[in-house]
Amino acid sequence: MAYPVKVGARERWTFAKIKETLELPNLIEIQRNSYQWFIDTGLRELFHDISPIQDFTGNLILQFVDYSLGEPKYSEDECKERDMTYAAPLRVKVRLINRETGEVKEQEVFMGDFPLMTDKGTFIINGAERVIVSQLVRSPGAYYAEGIDASGTKVYGATVIPNRGAWLEFETDNTESIYVRIDRTRKIPVTILLRALGYNTNARILELFDYDGRIQNTLEKDNTESEEEALVEIYKRLRPGEPPTVDSARNLLESLFFDPRRYDLGNVGRYKLHKKFNHGILTREVDGREEYIRTLTKEDIIYTIKYLLRLMDGEVKPDDIDHLGNRRLRSVGELLQNQFRIGLARMERVVRERMTIQDVDVITPQVLINIRPVVAAIKEFFGSSQLSQFMDQTNPLAELTHKRRLSALGPGGLSRERAGFEVRDVHTSHYGRMCPIETPEGPNIGLIGSLSTYARINEFGFIETPYRRVDKEKGIVTNQVDYLTADEEDKYFIAQANAPLDEEGHFLEKRVNARHGGEILVVPASQVDYMDVSPKQMVSVATALIPFLEHDDANRALMGANMQRQAVPLLRTEAPIVGTGMEWRAARDSGTVVLARNNGVVERVTAREIVIRTDNGHLETYRLQKFVRSNQGTCINQKPIVRKGERVSAGQTIADGPSTDQGELALGRNILVAFMTWEGYNYEDAILISEKLVKDDIFTSIHIEEYECDARDTKLGPEEITRDIPNVSEDVLKDLDERGIIRIGAEVRPGDILVGKVTPKGETELTAEERLLRAIFGEKAREVRDTSLRVPHGESGIVVDVKVFSRENGDELAPGVNELVRVYIAQKRKISVGDKMAGRHGNKGVISRILPEEDMPFLPDGTPIEIVLNPLGVPSRMNLGQILETHLGRAARALGITVATPVFDGATEEEIKEAFRKAGLPEDGKTILYDGRTGEPFDRPITVGYMYMLKLAHLVDDKIHARSTGPYSLVTQQPLGGKAQFGGQRFGEMEVWALEAYGAAYTLQEILTVKSDDVVGRVKTYEAIVKGENVPEPGVPESFKVLIKELQSLGLDVKVLSEENEEIEIKEDDDDVSESAQELGLDVHGQPNTAPESEGGNEEDKEAEADEDFDPADLDPSELELDADLNDDLVVPDEAYGDEE
């Protein structure tokens, strides 16, 4: 039966039966450890590899002696505020030696600012938090494969893949001869390569391979006699068309495989070859320290061929490239090292060139070294690499999962198009290393995964998972834990975590389920070598948060794991009644909660900070984040959960972050649900909710948008941020301060001015009156136009923060920018029809109706149901976890407790029934419900209980959109598409068919002309509507003119004829239209003027022919849709979440 355990700051009753012998590791250590390795070891390796740099004569030598990272210039928060990169200066001590004079110069050289990792495992690049995702790549080493050729004979192949350098491929043909390809060139008999390596006689070659018949076959095809001939033959293949000499051929072969600068197996490659061939070559001594041999050796090539012969004899099996023993992880550290290496190599070239050009006597290290290529390489990696991604910060789980993500995409990895089914599939070696459930749906399925809970990365980048060792002599499962890689694991028999043990650790059953070499077998207990440490060892963090996962279909569990990452942090958080016991670890390691660093007593608590007096008398201050905007526009807000005078211990949670409650992850709310249909409102996954959820702010979330406005220098003079805006009433300016910037706390609606800004306008011809005024008053009539920052369509809220940066105050701004203003607007979004909600079991739906509380079905005691879900959503989807959760949630709520039911080790049906009995509820969990409208009971008992529901980030407020007039595409003159462009709805081919089917001719004509791209017609229509006249006849649509022009450009003379066979002129120019549109304040030509100079209205003396007696001055400006500057501030979000979802 359940027993209580402490999780975070609360107690949960857990149903776990298996004792966990191993603590979960820190969940973001994969990021931290890798970066730490780079700072401590990776950089040193790089400088060691490149040093010394010599000039072409060997006289000057440049050595890199040591390096150090300084202190960052700004703190993390300042970097976010100022759009800076959180980085520390990298200084390198460099020594320049002149061999002739014996002179030595030492200098410390600054090598650029190096981005630092924050405690949370992220980087701050240009003010945005980013994550470097770990990449799964094929490990260097030797790989063997077998296949069948066209004639049906078995053929075999071997490939030696280095970290960088030329590939070496061996293959057989149907005559059982062995051939080799060097760096993807044409194949040659393998004996030619052996001769070139110095095994020059046939006898020596045969002796190497115990006079194997297949080598004899190959020798018969080999037309070379000596080492020299063999070298020349290889040279001809690799460099066709160049005159071959023996020396150049020898140098080529040397540099291809035996020169550490051109060929690198890496420590990993050497280790893999060592393991595969079991030969002794692993390290050699260099400068008194052991180093891995990172190039090929002649022995490696011979062993590779010997192994291929064994494969042909059937002694060994071919390799499986999707096995995690053959795929490794490149984490942050290694990715950075590779990038840095590219920069250093470019720098090395520059140094060599400068050594020859500069005067030897005055030369210093500082002069030689150009750090540009190094800085550029790092900048490029963090800014635009596919693996450097804008952090998903929707909620703490999304952050945590993003840092634990494994991607097979990216440079040096796979591409989406090329990846087949095998790579994407779940593999037996994933067990305990990579989650079989959490992966995106869509084109990236299986290419992006998530690290399992207990997995860790070893020094070679292979994923290891822990197992408890079995003492075979005593037959006891010990608490000693060994971490095994995927290829080591295949050799052992490994029992499951749920195999029953007695107190001492003996297996209770004679035969147990065990995994061995990718198979699941039933073996005698005495044969078992290892045992799983925990049932949740095979799944990732997000999957481990799904209660009753064992009762859900895998496809739905996948959606459940992915949708938890999209849950919006709510205004009032609440931890789940039915959890898995993993919640507090996820919250703690995500870094969104505040932990006490030392033991002590709380001295002072305010909303903004917590002060603790530690046991040794020091005061420690913890600053809390208040209403900060996350990358996804959700709200980050930390709240203290300790009181003054309370005693805290090190590691205790003292403040909750977003989506946490008492130190536990709390992504949603516990809601009373009933599984029943209600008047068809929950047909097809629709959800019916009670108005209580709206009134009591149960699913209310806060969203913060950031708007920015900068004042630049233009050709006509500087822009100015000011309150003095032309043609704007005082009423519109009421919330602006004297600088012209909105005050904090102001409530704003679409179209309100946030920052007043004016831009100088070009000089125009002056009228006689203006010239007279100018002559009298001598002042130039202010020629500026209003380019203020306004609230976009569909947005509103309350201004919560304003930040102003200016050149004068010494802030670093982009070139040409004098002042930058950022305005933050927060909105409270209550749950509304059209919002998407989901449970944790992949049960998602859209809200279709919000019913008054009194109309909802109610329990016998009068409690109204809060959400009504459709029971038909359960059987076909096979996610029964939601039903069990509902039952257990009801019992736990009645007993006043919270429970934990860990994955694969949770509550059984019997235990749930027992909980019902304790709570005095019927065992089937069903209740008679009454209709809230009539008070009549429904005709059968209904399943009712508490389910944990999430509100997802797909909110209807972000998707709803309407347009009257707005920007048009330049070429077709049709309205742009999409909400971001303030576009229209596309009325496509099929929609046209629908109207044709109904014979709605006029509607159709209007849609295809005046509502879209009939440039003349749409202005005249607007005019007619404004004046209340009849709408004129439509003209020729612009896209038709484009079609005609395209046909003419193909050399076809296409004319348009009227009914009377007269040619219709398609005019080039619609100046008159522009003119009348300008008067109307409409912009008819393409995307609204982006260049300030091209203001219309100076078309000299053309009169508006559209309608002489129409005076735009009669119009009230507020009625017009002025869209001159709609596109001026149109920014496409530069981070559309990397290449991920």
Swiss-Prot record:
It catalyses: RNA(n) + a ribonucleoside 5'-triphosphate = RNA(n+1) + diphosphate. The gene is rpoB. CDD domains: RNA_pol_B_RPB2. InterPro entries: DNA-dir_RNA_pol_bsu_ext_1_sf, DNA-dir_RNA_pol_bsu_external_1, DNA-dir_RNA_pol_su2, DNA-dir_RNAP_su2_dom, DNA-dir_RNAP_su2_hyb_sf, RNA_pol_bsu_bac, RNA_pol_bsu_CS, RNA_pol_bsu_protrusion. It comes from Moorella thermoacetica (strain ATCC 39073 / JCM 9320). Belongs to the RNA polymerase beta chain family. This is DNA-directed RNA polymerase subunit beta. The keyword Transcription applies. Keywords: DNA-directed RNA polymerase, Nucleotidyltransferase, Transcription, Transferase. GO terms for biological process: DNA-templated transcription. It comes from the Bacteria. Residues 1063-1141 are annotated as: Disordered. DNA-dependent RNA polymerase catalyzes the transcription of DNA into RNA using the four ribonucleoside triphosphates as substrates.
